Amino acid sequence: MLTTDSDPIVAIATAPGRGGIGVVRISFGRAGEAAAQPLMQALTGQTLAARRASYVPFLDASGDALDRGIALYFPAPHSYTGEHVLELQGHGGPVVLQLVLQRCIDAGRAFGLRLAEPGEFTRRAFLNDKLDLAQAEAVADLIEASTEAAARSAGRSLDGAFSRDIHALVEDVITLRMLVEATLDFPEEEIDFLEAADARGKLARIRERLGHVLSEARQGALLREGLSVVLAGQPNVGKSSLLNALAGAELAIVTPIAGTTRDKVAQTIQIEGIPLHVIDTAGLRDTEDEVEKIGIARTWNEIERADVVLHLLDARTGMTVEDEAIAGRFPAGVPVVRVLNKTDLTGLAPATRALDADLDLSEVRLSAKQGDGVALLREELLRIAGWQAGAESVYLARERHLIALRAAEEHLATAAAHADQNSQALDLFAEELRLAQDQLNSITGEFSSDDLLGVIFSRFCIGK
């Protein structure tokens, strides 16, 4: 069946499973009030007042009540989607919700009512200018938030904080483009428009503001995605003990027998609101045990995908030949923290130090068993992540936002280089400003392909 963005659509808007309340939502698309009024009459036996809660029966085709609950009618454009919307809020049992949903589809078949696709209600809100693209993505991020900090940041994006900063940057770039275009269009004038309007100073200020927005977006991306942290090292160096210490719970089995962990144990923990996906892995060593070999192979697969590797060492022996061989296989470009564990058996005090800034290699001494120095490791992980403690204005951001912001930053840097050249480079200056503007507009959806929209909204749940 060929679907369009103007079809009437319906879906269950609440999460699957049993609950006190279940919501069925209809957005009437191009059919509008011509479909809304007769469908309300068929489903509730009443004509509903706009934006007023009515306690009504939800009727089947014979006029018998399937359920009773609250019906809300939102005429366009004052609704979530910007279209005429009807919500039936009844009991949250899966059977009764499916009955009400099917009744809606049957009653609305004459108007082309169909089941909504994932994210289609929010897509309509975007297409009808109720939300821009960054705000629409924030709806999904708010639903999926795994920490309080992520939820609050998603809320800021939904309220438009991120979008307002992007729109302000776009307006500044447009103003600067106008100055450049004026200079190009009137070359015979003696006035230097760029010099008179302090164009270079304006560009510098735009780049400074963009840098601030990018910094906030990076923080938001951390809150959304978190970090993948892999515990690696020889058997019996305390990897499982460290996982338990970081999590504050007995998640992994700890014994003095080397090779106890044969497969990965994964746990997501929070540090200052950042989700850390910590993975305890099988000890790395030469072995003839076929099961253990499989676990070791999986360990290396996890290391290849890690954002950070915690290389655990026994503080009593330090870096051994075997540890050197393990470290030599770590992927380039991945930050590594050498964790000297079991300091309680050596008399060493917990401490942190940088080993190689260029390689992002550092060292933390701690005792996972006693908990001494674990706080230092948490601080080191925050440093590696680039987290700025106490950030209050963070908005949740996605990888595509960061890519667009970095691209805009590069175009503005190139524009600045052209601005310092002679007037023959002005057309290149103007072009780089245009490209920067396009990148910024792609964040809010001012310039977005249908393919991009399809990918974004397909990841929403049905009913949103």
Swiss-Prot record:
Chief localisation class: cytoplasm
Residues where Mg(2+) binds: 240, 261
Cofactor annotation: K(+)
MF annotations from Gene Ontology: GTP binding; GTPase activity; metal ion binding
Single GO BP term: tRNA methylation
Cysteines paired by S-S bonds: none
Residues of the TrmE-type G domain: 226-386
Pfam family, any one: TrmE_N
Cofactor annotation comment: Binds 1 potassium ion per subunit.
Enzyme Commission code: 3.6.-.-
Any Gene Ontology CC annotation: cytosol
Ligand binding (K(+)): 236, 255, 257, 260
PANTHER family: TRNA MODIFICATION GTPASE GTPBP3 (PTHR42714), TRNA MODIFICATION GTPASE GTPBP3, MITOCHONDRIAL (PTHR42714:SF2)
Family: Belongs to the TRAFAC class TrmE-Era-EngA-EngB-Septin-like GTPase superfamily. TrmE GTPase family.
Name of protein: tRNA modification GTPase MnmE
